[in-house]
């Protein structure tokens, strides 16, 4: 569930909470762990993309072999050695057997017909009453109805992922705007270089072109070094390069670091005394003269004028982290691997001290795999490898965090105490924003995320004060949504800004809007946006020369995204992209906001172009990606049509999208698969172009697929979102059930064949919906990596929406999947989970299975993927999990699970054996 990340239609996403929604899946181009959106090979960035860019490599795991599926009954006959016709021995006996078989088959067929005709579970009649929904838009594919069906392997393999170019914007040494960091592939041109955005193809000479690394390899003491990640210094004279990367958690990694001199094209270890020491994090000073880094959980500093490395801390260890987050802060708070911040003048370093001594450990067992370099002790080869994770579950002790400071010139560490009434065990440091003059803006929340406090700390004076305090519980009963987009605005009297300030997203009249606080100590802001719509991860960019703020918002529709600009005084709000069409845009701005990478992401074929901002007098407009191959595919294959509408439940308008199969015929009866995620603040119904598992189900299997974003999801206002506070699962499930009831009234829907499925939070919602519905509307469900008890999930995420279990015992009981009697009313359901899931622990599924065992239930199937984490990838498991979903769903809608509800032994085999024996 991690913190804020752009998420859309997400299957294997981790639980995520707010902002733009959930994390990536096989179709999402957002921020996540398991995206199959393709990044063009020629555009892989040499540095980590900035917060306003999205780009994720395909997570395919090689090729897959089509497996043969055998009918078990057919195989058993072969084992009996029965020959259906002919054969020399015992022809008379064979004829007797033949006629007995005929009689038995006819009788069996007749009996089966009577049973099926009288069974309510097999009546496929539906009500002809109309739905309560209102249809608003249909997105039809370009493909002919007789086009090819989309194979599942093509979807999982990334064939349908749009090519997305990620751009690493970089400022020039003199503040030049519109520069890109580029890495050449295939040995063509210099390996690492800076180009002007107007010369992105390198076709003409440009004064802003700078070669940083001529070759893709360099040598240190005869050792051949091939950099995997690079970070140029702000003055572009040195490159920090990393090799031998080892992945840690979702965002964190370690590696060996090197300093590469641009002028001499030579390199040296970051720490000459420990060249093989694995570094967890490293970052440049704004003045380019030093690098601060964390190794073995301690912080060090290396000044470029010396080869000496100086320790800033020395007591870091297994339970004490400096400058990097622990697991829960990485996953749920920062969404990244850094907890170190330089002051803008480079004179001070602030860093987080994280103490997780009191945090309980959770074991993750690996039965088949081992960490790189790990060798079991002799005699222990047959035992699982157990990884212990400090994982604070809901109500358990959290890590305690404190913000520390280091004076670079004086070489001394210190802390600044600010009394804001948050105790150490009730504090989450959510965001740190460097400001001018050695100042830092610090956003803190209480543990249950309903109190937010903003503090200004002056490192030079070693003092600080609280400048803002809000109690969201008193505003709307909701929660504070984590932010990573707060933007500092320096003072500039010549530009009309006499004081410094910052832009933040706040709650205004029930919606998330942009506010400008100036001076920074002012608790009352100037509103930059207002209305019944919301800003998204805003601001995207700020033009300080012209006092213009750029942002993405849902002003036209909750399921649309458009790019807007507004003046710092709140005037001249305008849309920058095509205002006449419903669409989904994203944007990435250059550091000075003079240029932008505009990304059209749907509903039609995505494209990208580089353009100058409206405030930039130097006009520029160039398309860099049209996804022609994707357009070609969409003309060859039959894609479903998308029908967008809203349905009103309890006075709330819920966005819905229905995928109809090619050659849809309203006179036929179609089974329906509901797909959902449903996590707080997430969004699954939107106008992005996606070809995913849902597309495959509609296109290849010919089923209807419906997705509804119920209450609790994002971008429909705080009232819509925060109603789920303290009671996760209830309203969300209610909305799925009511929507399914309305869909069951449609003349083309077979209401006796309705299923629901989801992954992660969607897995929880699948089970909660089945539990609440008790077989009345949904007959089938498929839950992947589900939460079944919120006491098992991490504290930061869970308590944000549920409070601590100690303060909401009844809510936790209600939110757990515990009513086995209700689940027994469904025809059948499927649960799948990875045994090494470090996010939603396998404990969730095992606990539910125990409850089902106690009740003697048997209307479910379980598939466990050994050593797979939350994404379920190990040993081609990602292919398997989707193939199992597909096969299981086909069997469900073919009535196979109805047949298995009351299995009876077949006497046919015994009769034949006896006849063969005595004949």
Swiss-Prot record:
It catalyses: Release of an N-terminal dipeptide, Xaa-Yaa-|-Zaa-, from a polypeptide, preferentially when Yaa is Pro, provided Zaa is neither Pro nor hydroxyproline. The chain crosses the membrane at residues 96-116. It is a single-pass type II membrane protein. The active site is at residues 760, 837, 870. It holds the Pfam family DPPIV_N. One of its GO terms (biological process) is proteolysis. It is found in: Vacuole membrane. Residues 44-55 have a biased composition (Polar residues). Its EC number is 3.4.14.5. Residues 1-89, 121-150 are annotated as: Disordered. It is an enzyme of class 3 (hydrolase). Residues 1-95 are cytoplasmic. One of its GO terms (molecular function) is dipeptidyl-peptidase activity. Keywords: Aminopeptidase, Glycoprotein, Hydrolase, Membrane, Protease, Serine protease, Signal-anchor, Transmembrane, Transmembrane helix, Vacuole. Residues 27-38, 127-136 have a biased composition (Low complexity). Glycans are attached at residues 207, 303, 355, 577, 665, 814, 819. InterPro entries: AB_hydrolase_fold, Peptidase_S9_cat, Peptidase_S9B_N, Serine_Prot_S9B/DPPIV. One of its GO terms (cellular component) is plasma membrane. Type IV dipeptidyl-peptidase which removes N-terminal dipeptides sequentially from polypeptides having unsubstituted N-termini provided that the penultimate residue is proline. Belongs to the peptidase S9B family. PANTHER family: DIPEPTIDYL PEPTIDASE 10, ISOFORM B (PTHR11731:SF200), PROTEASE FAMILY S9B,C DIPEPTIDYL-PEPTIDASE IV-RELATED (PTHR11731). This is Probable dipeptidyl-aminopeptidase B. The gene is DAPB.
